[in-house]
Amino acid sequence: MNLSELKVGQRARVTKLNIENREISRHLLDMGVTRGVEIKVKKIAPMGDPVDIELRDYELCLRKADLSHIEGEVIK
């Protein structure tokens, strides 16, 4: 599943980063978005972008465009 499709309150475990742009890939890796990390959607801005997520005991705001490059499996 593409992580840009997650709804508020849903959790997913990152399985793959599909990013050809090394700069964006490095940026996400530097922020802790790595394979195996658990992500929870905390809130979504009124216009749908950006998305506030929680991972590794901190929160980040990511654009939907960046989240669309991250694959994961939903955790129930």
Located regions from the model:
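Absolute protein N-terminus
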Residues: M1-N2
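Short, acidic/hydrophobic/Gly-rich beta-strand patch recurrent on exposed beta strands
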Residues: T15-K16, D30-G32, D52-L55
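Short alpha-helix capping/helix-loop boundary micro-motifs
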Residues: E23-H27
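C-terminal structural segments of small proteins and small subunits
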Residues: A45-K76
